[in-house]
Amino acid sequence: MKSFLVDQDGYYGEFGGAYVPEILHKCVEELKNTYLGVLESEDFKKEFDQLLRDYVGRPSPLYLARRLSEKYGCKMYLKREDLNHTGAHKINNTIGQILLARRMGKKRIIAETGAGQHGVATATVCALMDMECIVYMGKTDVERQHINVEKMKMLGATVIPVTSGNMTLKDATNEAIRDWCCHPADTYYIIGSTVGPHPYPDMVARLQSVISEEIKKQLMEKEGRDHPDYLIACVGGGSNAAGTIYHYINDGRVGIILAEAGGKGIETGMTAATIQLGKMGIIHGARTYVIQNEDGQIEEPYSISAGLDYPGIGPIHANLAAQRRATVLAVNDDEAIEAAYELTKLEGIIPALESAHALGALKKLKFKPEDVVVLTVSGRGDKDIETYLSFNEK
């Protein structure tokens, strides 16, 4: 049977690998040779599970959304990652990676962030574990996510606004990598998504796989079977999607639907629909689909959602799309906003703009009444209230 998980060289099919500058080769090799031994050790698992339970508040609920189910003619469950401490799925990964960094003897943590959720989650765990924390964030994102910036500062992190390029997630990642090049000995770079050189995509997917592990148990309790008919998640880099599908990736009974950011429309050039528009390239150390021009220069992506405007895609998802294991839909800004308002009015849950893209995919799908569908609400919408309000006023 074909496996959609990573091979020993860090590839998912033809996607992935580790293309890094020579100065970082030693750091990436050290990480590659260390991560599995630590993640699979009993003492790590014990500490990780205890923190997920007592600090994050896991397991996150699997909620049967009755009014949404009625509207879309199926049994619609929401995996409530928005209810985690810090308000998103990101903390599952930051706890795991910072526990790893501590075991590797690193004293300084650096991170990139787009919507600010990964930055807040990193700053939170650094405060908990008494580690120095530096977060790189594009100036555009600093302005549109200022509440998260203030939270990071309150938690003791240094937030560095990045003024190169489009001043968004890609540029923040570039600066974080530059910092890592300058401080390879004492610094651990914590990537927030399933992107970057191997072993990051696999490590982040493993740490987020607690999501699908819980879905299996929760569905068994609620439905008497451990698998849904469909899983739906939004993808930027792809960490919440990877966590949602991890334990089902090789299970042909389960349909995988990924919603990427269509922006103002995939034909407009103002988009972040990487899987649909990207060509094979290398970005931040991985071979994957990249939005690029005819000369191979990376194009600036656009999305109303700060967490989805990335011009690449995690290699795990690029491979799923290439092998037709996943259905990929582009959801435009206005469709996502409309879906967020719909969830709020039907179920009393205000989702993050990123999660709203997964909800926006529902109108593009047809379900049977007996279908069991699980959609991951990756984060809560507090950080996006101003965007929702300004869009509604138009």
From Swiss-Prot:
Residue numbers bearing the N6-(pyridoxal phosphate)lysine modification: K90
Reactions this protein catalyses: (1S,2R)-1-C-(indol-3-yl)glycerol 3-phosphate + L-serine = D-glyceraldehyde 3-phosphate + L-tryptophan + H2O
SUPFAM superfamilies: Tryptophan synthase beta subunit-like PLP-dependent enzymes
Pathway: Amino-acid biosynthesis; L-tryptophan biosynthesis; L-tryptophan from chorismate: step 5/5
Keyword Amino-acid biosynthesis: yes
Top-level taxonomic group: Bacteria
Listed EC numbers: 4.2.1.20
GO cellular component, one term: cytoplasm
The keyword Amino-acid biosynthesis is assigned to this record: yes
GO BP of this protein: L-tryptophan biosynthetic process
Alphabetized UniProt keyword annotations: Amino-acid biosynthesis, Aromatic amino acid biosynthesis, Lyase, Pyridoxal phosphate, Tryptophan biosynthesis
InterPro entries associated with the record: Trp_synth_b_CS, Trp_synth_beta, Trp_synth_beta/beta-like, TrpB-like_PALP, TrpB-like_PALP_sf
GO MF, one annotated term: tryptophan synthase activity
Cofactors named for this entry: pyridoxal 5'-phosphate
Annotated family: Belongs to the TrpB family.
Role summary: The beta subunit is responsible for the synthesis of L-tryptophan from indole and L-serine.
Binding partners and assembly: Tetramer of two alpha and two beta chains.
Protein's UniProt name: Tryptophan synthase beta chain
The organism of origin for this protein: Bacteroides thetaiotaomicron (strain ATCC 29148 / DSM 2079 / JCM 5827 / CCUG 10774 / NCTC 10582 / VPI-5482 / E50)
